[in-house]
Design a protein with these regions (language model features):
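Helix-boundary and loop/linker segments of multi-pass membrane transporters
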Residues: 42-48, 88, 92, 153-157
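Membrane-embedded alpha-helical bundles of multi-pass transporters/translocases
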Residues: 50-64, 95-186, 190-199
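Intracellular loop-helix junctions on the cytosolic face of multi-pass helical membrane proteins
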Residues: 1-73, 77-83, 113, 117-123
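Short, solvent-exposed coil/turn linker segments
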Residues: 11, 71, 93-94, 159
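Short coil/turn segments at secondary-structure boundaries
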Residues: 72, 87-91, 128-130
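Short extramembrane helix-to-coil loop segments that connect adjacent transmembrane helices in Major
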Residues: 77-96
């Protein structure tokens, strides 16, 4: 490591690569440790195997959703019109304003989804289907963000509507994955590893 620093080969890209490898290795190691443990029963082991695809789906979703604080923030700053015309007056707002849209949609959607799941009762989709729909919504939110570039080019500042709709779509995915992910983890985690799997 010191040799890399002194030869100027240790840079930000290398740090990102190192952390990416660590982030992949740790869950693999941990699942191997759980599955090979003598503390879990055969039933618990089969539940852990059932949980692994949901864990991977959760990782994919949060990788997409967390782009909002980076990629979409840059899009807001560089490629979004940061003003509204209200009754002939031009109102400017900072690009950081868009970071408040995520929690706003969460507050709007939580009662809607709580009502929906209550209304559907036992007819609601399975946890696996909710995960699939959530991943679809996350992917759709980024496909949506391709449209302004395709329609207007990359040199034009576009309406804030594009970003707002992107967040509206991805937060639907969060409503499907976040609470269900915690619930499924609690149900499928072996008793000996329940706290570790929740964290």
């Amino acid at each position: 490591l010191l040799g890399l620093v002194f030869t100027h080969q240790f840079n930000v890209d290398m740090i990102v690569n190192i952390f990416t490898v660590i982030a992949v290795i740790i869950p693999i190691y941990y699942f191997f440790k759980i599955l090979s443990s003598q503390k879990i029963t055969a039933t618990e082991r089969s539940r852990v195997f059932a949980y692994i695809p949901l864990f991977i789906a959760g990782v994919l979703f949060w990788s997409i959703e967390e782009q909002g604080s980076v990629v979409l923030a840059l899009f807001a700053d560089d490629q979004t019109r940061l003003y509204f015309n209200v009754f002939g007056n031009q109102i400017h707002f900072p690009s950081s304003f868009f970071q408040s849209i995520n929690p706003l949609f969460i507050m709007i959607y939580v009662p809607i989804f709580a009502w929906l799941w209550g209304k559907m009762g036992k007819k609601q989709p399975s946890s696996a289907k909710k995960f699939a729909y959530g991943l679809f919504a996350a992917g759709l939110s980024f496909l949506w963000m391709m449209l302004p570039g395709m329609l207007f080019g990359t040199d034009v500042k576009v309406s804030p509507f594009w970003l707002i709709m992107s967040w509206a779509i991805v937060i639907v995915g969060e409503m499907l994955i976040s609470p269900i992910g915690l619930s499924v983890t609690t149900k499928l985690a072996p008793k000996s590893f329940q706290a570790q799997m929740m964290s």
